[in-house]
Amino acid sequence: RDLARKHANFYIIDAAKLAVQVGLGEKRTNNILQAAFFALTKVIPLDMAVEDMKKNNYNSYFKKAGQKIVDLNDKAVDLGISAAVKVEIPASWADAPDTPMAEPKNASAFVRDIVLPMDRQQGDKLPVSVFQKHGVLDGTWENGTSAFSKRGVATKVPKWNAESCIQCNRCAMCCPHAAIRPVLLAEEEKAQVPASFETVPAKGLGKDAPSYFFRMQVSPYDCLGCGVCLTACPANQSDKTADALVMTPFEEMKSEQANFDEVAMNDKYLKKDVINSKTVKNMQFAKPYFQFSAACAGCAETTYIKLLSQMVGDRMYAGNAAGCSSAISGGAPILPYCKDSQGRGPAWEHSLFEDNAEFAYGFFHAQDAIRKELLIRLESMKDAGIAPAEIEDYINNWNDGEKSRAVSDALIAALEKCEQTEDVSYILENREYLSKKSIWAIGGDGWAYDIGFGGIDHVMAQN
């Protein structure tokens, strides 16, 4: 409608197809698009633009890649000049009505009222009252909203070949966007999932593991097509076997989204009895609490953050430095940090200033002070005979990150049944601090080695 009303000249170009035709590969579209831009806009004489682009190709590629690559990029420039196709805009588009957009499943009121309008570039139309209604005037934000931004931007996504897969889960570990995940199903669960969710017997889970069925499931609409999973796959690097992952056109794979949403994203299918942090394989059966970020295709930073979230995500506090990691972690409205079915997940914060090491260290000291106060009160309550067994168990494990969650839950359940004295009420009001948190300062090399190095040096010197 806007195109018609503004009488815009509208052009399209299949740059990925042309890049393949040239021989550069579908992702090397820069010269094609740049040449098309200069041909259409004429911001400088086209001959001058072509000459400068080809000169830049030589300077950029000759020394490190040779004349062949220079020639391919020059050919891309020549193709791009005439590749744009004009689309005639019907006059009827000027009066095109708004089409109601289907709301995603499981979208909360916050997502419907705030996130989706912002994702449609309509955030400026939101009144202050809608933020007040949802209690986010202080800047807090519902997490997990990236799950509702199904962009579907990859031209090709990986297709799993069960016969060649060795079930090492390296592809899942290396995926920057948590868009490919291993799933285990018990025999009785196979009847609960779609018929298209084909599995094979799981292997290599450990000698005491139950018998499960395995599938590697991709999310076509969340995949960015970077190909990191293919590079990480041992079967793909072997000449002895067929590839376990094959890049396949998006149109052929988009039906797989239902399998991902209904099974791979469903916490009830998580198999906690095989999850451990001792092996790459078994760790990938854990839920990623960092998923579908807006990071660039193939981003390495998000791979580390995602893996960290799988290890300690349900009790993780993160202070984030300024940089790429803060932009992709806290760029409203799409937040990749999420919570599980029990409402647990990472708590994330970003300091306005370049003091992230000190900022996260403050998290640690605050947690330490609050939890020690709780411990003093609990010891007094134990002496008074209030829930002595549960308090004893908690005191013995309060500083163990893995065990403190379970003993904290048991303690809370016991205290809720007790007489609500001042101490009991205080403990229950501060229950979120009972379990030990895993506190992290996250940032890139600009923060760690340059502007924030003094803070890191200070924090490490305190230990």
Language-model segments: residues:
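Ferredoxin-like iron-sulfur electron-transfer modules
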Residues: P100, G144-Q167, L184-G225, L245-M253, ...
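Beta-sheet entry/capping signal
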Residues: N9, V157, A172-A179, R215, ...
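Segments forming glycine/polar-rich beta-alpha architectures that bind adenosine-containing cofactors
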Residues: I114-R181, A186-A191
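Cofactor-binding active-site loop characterized by glycine-rich and histidine/acidic residues
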Residues: Q257-N463
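Glycine-rich, acidic loop regions that bind phosphate or pyrophosphate groups
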Residues: R1-K27, L184-L205, N236, T241-V246, ...
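Iron-sulfur cluster-binding cysteine motifs and their immediate structural context
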Residues: G144-S146, R170-Q192, S219, V228-E252, ...
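Active-site cofactor/cluster-binding pocket
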Residues: R1-R120, K190, P194
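Flexible loop/turn segments at secondary-structure boundaries
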Residues: A19-V20, I166-Q167, R181-P182, E188-K190, ...
